[in-house]
Design a protein with these regions (language model features):
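Hydrophobic ligand-binding cavity/cleft-lining segments
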Residues: 1-39
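Short, surface-exposed coil-to-beta transition loops
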Residues: 6, 65-69, 88-92
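Residue-level recognition of well-ordered beta-strand positions that form the cores
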Residues: 8-10, 56, 71-73, 84, ...
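A short, structured loop/turn motif at beta-sheet edges
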Residues: 15-16, 47-49, 73-78, 94-104
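Hydrophobic pocket/interface hotspot
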Residues: 18-19, 28, 53-55, 72, ...
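Glycine-rich portal/gate segments that line the openings of hydrophobic small-molecule binding cavities
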Residues: 40-84
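Beta-strand/loop substructures that line and gate deep hydrophobic ligand-binding cavities in soluble
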Residues: 80-126, 130-131
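Short, highly charged C-terminal tails/helix-capping segments
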Residues: 134-138
């Protein structure tokens, strides 16, 4: 990876639940957006090595949106997923079981060049924090 950004969060739920909520499209549409003026109207995933994922993120007023999509390169069940986005950037998500009811997620991603590193770190963390709140409430 080239000059990656790393973010992490601790979630008070067991690793198997965190894993399922993170990769199951029926849950992804509920949390995969940075702020309340965004939403994720569509999430598709062929969750296997070589499988494709495609998540649509949009402003609720439909004034702007984009697809977050790519391919899954490697899966170690309940441990990590390595993938690459359509623009070639690499993403890794690690799931560390702290105890039976606590899981740490670490996301490592290559930044794109259009936005500052800090803006990307804040945006990705906002989505990860929304995930954290969602999985702890459901």
């Amino acid at each position: 990876m080239t000059d990656p950004i790393t973010i992490k969060i601790t979630i008070l739920q067991p690793v198997h639940k965190v894993w399922d909520y993170f990769y199951n499209p029926k849950h992804i549409v509920k949390w995969n957006f940075p702020t309340t003026n965004w939403h994720c109207p569509k999430a598709e995933s062929d969750f296997q090595e070589g499988g494709r994922f495609n998540y649509r993120l949009e402003y609720k007023d439909k004034s702007f949106g984009y697809n977050f999509s790519g391919y899954i390169d490697e899966i170690e069940v309940l441990k990590y997923v390595k993938s690459h986005l359509d623009d070639g950037r690499k993403v890794e998500v690690h799931f560390n079981k702290i105890d039976d009811n606590t899981t740490e997620i670490i996301e490592i991603f290559e930044p794109e060049i259009q936005n500052s590193r800090e803006m990307q770190r804040v945006g990705w963390y906002a989505i990860l924090d929304r995930f954290h709140k969602y999985v702890e409430k459901h």
